Amino acid sequence: MATTETFEISKPEPEWRRLLTPEQFRVLRKHGTEHAWSSPLDKEYGSGSYLCAGCDLPLFASDTKFDSGTGWPSFWDPIEGAVRTSTDRKLFMVRTEVHCRRCGGHLGHVFDDGPNPTGLRYCMNGIALKFVRA
């Protein structure tokens, strides 16, 4: 993990590999990025909650989801206290990484080009999320 934080849920790498699909492991544990438009959650607009695929912590409510046109599920606000951020200096730029506050799984990045009321765009990897209908 890029961060030195400690988390409520901590597992050794072999256990994460057993619990997650190879692609989930690559994104959540190794800070990967799925291909744009590859996740069915990008176009999911049902009522419900988006949970961390690593630990099932509710992260986003469906009423904060919007179509950003980027090919990744995007939200304008997380559930209070559900995510943490850290500075990501990879790819020759500075970005704000978003990770699950409970297991530390990499979710995506947050940008300041989102809609009102926050002006933020939480650009998430769909493979890092689970959608649970209300």
Task: List each model region and its residues.
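Accessory (non-J-domain) regions of J-domain/Hsp40 co-chaperones
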Residues: 1-7
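A short Gly-Trp-Pro
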Residues: 7-134
